[in-house]
Amino acid sequence: MSKLISKQGKRPALSQSGLAKPSTSKKSSASKNANTETAKLLTKALHPRNVHKYGYDFAALSKTLPALTPFVGPNAYGNISIDFANPDAVKQLNAALLLHHYSIRDWDIPHGYLCPPIPGRVDYLHYLADLLSAPHKGKANRNIRALDIGTGANGIYPLLGIESYSWQFVASDIDKVSLDNVDEILAKNPQLAAKLSLRLQLNPKAIFNGVIEKDEYFDVSLCNPPFHRSLADANAGTQRKLSNLAKNRGQSQQQAVQAKVALNFGGQKAELWCEGGEAAFLANMISESKGFAAQCLWFTSLVSKSENLKPCYAQLAKQGTSEVKTIEMHQGNKITRILAWSYLSLSQRQAWAKLRDQSR
């Protein structure tokens, strides 16, 4: 695992601002309003800064990475594409996208690990940049320090965040194989290594505990939590995705059901499911975040199931958050939500940003 540790976030002394003691009073009108009327920001397509918003240029991608060429051809509708149910095709597409748009070389993942869709992953980062008051044009603030919870073998959020915004990242995972693979990617891309620190989470039931160190500060945390409650649920979800892809290719439902599970829709246990599923994971994350209220400006997570939002709002209100936001990202027919919360008041967040820019 890489020993290159990114610069530890240091928060300057703020004896007058109260930043170290975020307001948690239930009587605070700002806190009450933030928790009872969650801000909801709606988008209809990929983020305006997303370079993938117009689709894939397979000719250019194949030129950048010739290994993609054998997988490119007309689909059932006569459009140039790849077979998205073919794990090798999807992996080569990702490698081509990362090389062509982000100058990331030799990206790869071990057999059976999750292969993420690049456009949706980078969308999350663009909206986080907006959340952190980054400019809407050009490069965003380069002083941002981010924490990726459950980075996986693909390490996709830190890789994209470093190349898109030059952010500093700490990435954690409970799976050593995943972190070892990200470390191999860093070895092939030295421009990334100085900005990314990898940390093994030794307690599979913990999220922030054991990862965030004393006197360490982050501008934002991000996470794509496990979705399913069990391996059986995960496999059923995989079969549904394969069935939908088969319909798009004109294959029969029976052919789809007989398709081999996993691979590009695969993933190890920690990537796809946990006891209690997404709802339980989010509840644990929110609970732990309280203990680091003054060490992270914004906590965020993706939320796939809309029904999981209401209990999150209730829990966040009880914990005295100052601000809660929900950002809906529309990617084709899929809607994914970013849930973001902060324990710091508006004035504290403004002081944080000002001191961050002055001190790093």
Curated annotation (Swiss-Prot):
SUPFAM superfamilies: S-adenosyl-L-methionine-dependent methyltransferases. GO terms for biological process: rRNA base methylation. Residues 23-36 have a biased composition (Low complexity). It is found in: Cytoplasm. Residues 1-36 are annotated as: Disordered. InterPro entries: METTL16/RlmF, rRNA_lsu_MeTfrase_F, SAM-dependent_MTases_sf. Its EC number is 2.1.1.181. GO terms for molecular function: 23S rRNA (adenine(1618)-N(6))-methyltransferase activity. The keyword Transmembrane does not apply. It catalyses: adenosine(1618) in 23S rRNA + S-adenosyl-L-methionine = N(6)-methyladenosine(1618) in 23S rRNA + S-adenosyl-L-homocysteine + H(+). GO terms for cellular component: cytoplasm. HAMAP family: 23SrRNA_methyltr_F. Belongs to the methyltransferase superfamily. METTL16/RlmF family. This is Ribosomal RNA large subunit methyltransferase F. The lineage of its organism: Bacteria, Pseudomonadati, Pseudomonadota, Gammaproteobacteria, Alteromonadales.
